């Protein structure tokens, strides 16, 4: 069945800068905000934008991510005509390779896209936190007569050299793309959100297929510069909302803190734009008689007998008597014993922090504890990780 636009979510990245949190799972499957996994945001954006056909391109350690997505029913994507499809690298009669880059991942799945013969294809990163109506971006794409539209967001000038920067004319047309420029001319950073006319993009892939010397493996490094060289009509779509690339431990911690310290920046309670997830069947949270909880997100299944402040606790977390959890992100099913102090830390899934452990914030560095780690009683962790 022909679709006007389908979405392809790039979700195969390892996320090596997240260190211990991606040892066993893909970056888009990392827990966020007490209740969610990172990929929930783009899946919810697709559903809320009226996009009913979504391909999720996985590669690195996909088991938990695949299980989380399932049939897509939690995002209303279990459709007869459309739905969500998990697409992994595969072999055919000629070749079989891992995805070599963002564009190569789409190229390998041309047959899937052709099944729906869309006018447009929406390319998304599965590891960013934001809420966006893609139908508005598509409207912009049509109004401009664009062949390729890239969503951009203004970043602080002193941070612009960390991003792929789009240099634009007054009409928002893009005349130059610079990857992490040392002296940026603009502060419009690419969000990794693209709309392409499918026939045009497909023609580029077919050109590379015929000529082994042509490399279109990556959108930012290869394909977008080539399109600009060919004077393809390319426009920058300005996005004004909250957006964060949670590619590092610091940025992941910052984004979690944003939802408790400035909840208006990323309103998770907005009834008009809900963020859906594959929820766990767990009892309500329990707050003990002598517990003290302030400015925190506490998920279902938590049992709080101590103090929790300025923190995000995922489902199934236990905080024992006399324990304090301050300025921290605690991932699912962590058990914290009695008389424990945890300050400015990120604790991985299913870790056990035994009685009288001290995890202290000394130099304002984030303390990190690996998933499934067992911290022995009376250990002291200062400015570091396990």
UniProtKB/Swiss-Prot annotation:
GO biological process, one term: glycogen biosynthetic process
InterPro entries recorded: ADP-Glc_PPase, ADP_Glu_pyroP_CS, GlgC_bac, GlmU/GlgC-like_hexapep, NTP_transferase_dom, Nucleotide-diphossugar_trans, Trimer_LpxA-like_sf
Transferase keyword on record: yes
Pathway noted in the entry: Glycan biosynthesis; glycogen biosynthesis
Binding positions for alpha-D-glucose 1-phosphate per the UniProt entry: 99, 164, 179-180, 190
Alphabetized GO MF terms: ATP binding; glucose-1-phosphate adenylyltransferase activity
SUPFAM superfamilies on file: Nucleotide-diphospho-sugar transferases, Trimeric LpxA-like enzymes
Catalytic activity: alpha-D-glucose 1-phosphate + ATP + H(+) = ADP-alpha-D-glucose + diphosphate
Keywords: ATP-binding, Carbohydrate metabolism, Glycogen biosynthesis, Glycogen metabolism, Nucleotide-binding, Nucleotidyltransferase, Transferase
Lineage: superkingdom: Bacteria
Catalytic activity, EC: 2.7.7.27
Family indicated by similarity: Belongs to the bacterial/plant glucose-1-phosphate adenylyltransferase family.
PANTHER family per record: GLUCOSE-1-PHOSPHATE ADENYLYLTRANSFERASE (PTHR43523:SF2), GLUCOSE-1-PHOSPHATE ADENYLYLTRANSFERASE-RELATED (PTHR43523)
Assembly with partners or alone: Homotetramer.
Annotated function: Involved in the biosynthesis of ADP-glucose, a building block required for the elongation reactions to produce glycogen. Catalyzes the reaction between ATP and alpha-D-glucose 1-phosphate (G1P) to produce pyrophosphate and ADP-Glc.
Record protein name field: Glucose-1-phosphate adenylyltransferase
Native source organism of the sequence: Clostridioides difficile (strain 630)
């Amino acid at each position: 069945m022909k679709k006007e636009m389908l979405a392809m979510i790039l979700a195969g990245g390892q996320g090596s800068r997240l260190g211990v949190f991606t040892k066993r799972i893909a970056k888009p499957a990392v827990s966020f905000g007490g209740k969610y996994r990172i990929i929930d945001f783009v899946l919810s954006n697709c559903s809320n934008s009226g996009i009913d056909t979504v391909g999720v391109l996985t590669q690195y350690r996909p088991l938990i991510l695949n299980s989380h997505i399932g049939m897509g029913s939690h995002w209303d994507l279990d459709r007869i005509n459309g739905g969500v499809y998990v697409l992994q690298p595969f072999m055919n009669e000629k070749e079989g390779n891992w995805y070599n880059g963002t564009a190569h991942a789409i190229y390998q799945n041309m047959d899937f896209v052709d099944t729906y013969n869309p006018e447009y294809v929406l390319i998304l990163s599965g590891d960013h936190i934001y809420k966006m109506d893609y139908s508005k971006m598509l409207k912009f794409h049509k109004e401009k007569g664009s062949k390729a539209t890239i969503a951009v967001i203004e970043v602080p000038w002193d941070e612009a050299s960390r991003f792929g920067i789009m240099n634009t004319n007054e009409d928002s047309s893009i005349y130059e793309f610079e990857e992490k420029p040392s002296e940026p001319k603009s502060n419009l950073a690419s969000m990794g959100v693209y709309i392409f006319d499918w026939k045009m993009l497909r023609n580029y892939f077919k050109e590379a297929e015929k000529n082994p010397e042509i490399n279109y493996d990556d959108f930012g490094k290869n394909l977008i510069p080539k399109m600009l060289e060919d004077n393809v009509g390319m426009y920058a779509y300005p996005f004004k909302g909250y957006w964060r690339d949670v590619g590092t431990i610091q940025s992941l911690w910052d984004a979690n803190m944003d939802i408790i310290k400035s909840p208006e920046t990323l309103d998770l309670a907005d009834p008009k734009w809900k963020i859906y997830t594959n929820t766990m069947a767990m009892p309500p949270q329990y707050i003990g008689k002598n517990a003290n909880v302030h400015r925190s997100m506490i998920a279902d299944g938590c049992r709080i007998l101590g103090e929790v402040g300025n923190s995000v606790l995922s489902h199934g977390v236990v905080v024992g008597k006399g324990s304090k959890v301050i300025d921290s992100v605690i991932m699912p099913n962590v058990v914290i014993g009695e008389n424990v102090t945890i300050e400015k830390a990120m604790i991985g899934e299913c870790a056990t922090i035994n009685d009288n452990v001290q995890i202290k914030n000394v130099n304002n560095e984030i303390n990190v504890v690996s998933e499934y780690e067992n911290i022995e009683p009376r250990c002291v962790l200062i400015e570091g990780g396990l």
